[in-house]
Amino acid sequence: MESALRFFALTGLLMASTTTARDVPQNVRDLYNSIRSQGSCKNQLKGGFYSQEGDSKNFGYCGDHLADYKIMYLQGKNGELVNMDIDCDGALGEGDGSCDSSGDTQPQTTFQETVAGYNKGIKDLNAYIHSFVVLGNDGSKNGYIEFKPEQYGIEPLSTVAVVCGDKMFYGVWGDTNGDDGPPLIGEVSDSLGRACYGSAVNGNAAHDENDVLYIAFAGSDAVPGANGAKWNAKSFSEFESSLGSLGDKLVQRIAGGGGGGGSPGDPPASDCSWEGHCLGDKCSKDGDCDGELVCKAKKCAVDA
């Protein structure tokens, strides 16, 4: 029995080591540290979520850098970010069995029709292969807290950067949280979770520490589309690496990323011409927001 346990432990370590992680760029590392040192979000787009069932419900979607870097991220209070739960939804097919223990598997992901419409030989995302992140909360049950990232420019199947365990991976926004449980945030596909934390996570085991940074990028330029990613990839590494070029470009939006002709450390130019009335800023009526933005839930948002 002891030798068997050693075998499975070694297998988990080998699996984690064969996945090539990205180094965390200095500008992303600086952002990570500044978010945690700030303690809590100043421009919370929506709060009242759990990082895991039964915790403080002090977690939410943050828009502190929605106007300057065009990013949204998840954050708690007192320096906490969020945890990493494991999603096994979608077209699993054959895998390593790490999703077998999941008691909450849905047969399709939220954007299944779009994925199938890419005509790349797959019907849906596969949690064993595709690196995807769960964002947004949809439900109709009484008291369930909803949030739609689209209202803040985050588009379906757009690129998301995940900083976990002092490494970084790229994924896409591929699923949403439903009201079959409490309003939760902080979840990724099984393959992405295991790339981050190896065999310590599976369909029934999460990474519980609130130290994971999820960075979603607003705008249509963050969407790889049918031909910008290897949707018919046969492995996690093949799919994740196909997002590298676009992901690296998007990360340069963050102060210190350089590129685009700006000086390192300067935030990228925003499309908003009315400072203080941009995407994610506070408002009381539509006229308080720049351009075609509208006022929703007292925040300037895209009219979706």
Residue ranges with predicted function:
Residues 1-22:
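Fungal secretory targeting signals
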Residues 22-167, 171, 177-180, 197-200, ...:
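Cell wall/extracellular polymer interaction/catalysis modules
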Residues 179-192:
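Short, solvent-exposed secondary-structure boundary/capping segments
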Residues 190-196, 209:
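Aromatic sugar-binding interfaces of carbohydrate-active proteins
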Residues 202-211:
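Intrinsically disordered, low-complexity linker and terminal regions at domain boundaries
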Residues 215-221, 299-304:
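Short beta-strand-to-coil "C-cap" segments at the C-terminal boundary of structured domains/repeats
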Residues 257-264:
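Intrinsically disordered, low-complexity regions enriched in glycine and serine
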Residues 264-304:
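Secreted, cysteine-rich disulfide-bonded mini-domains of extracellular proteins
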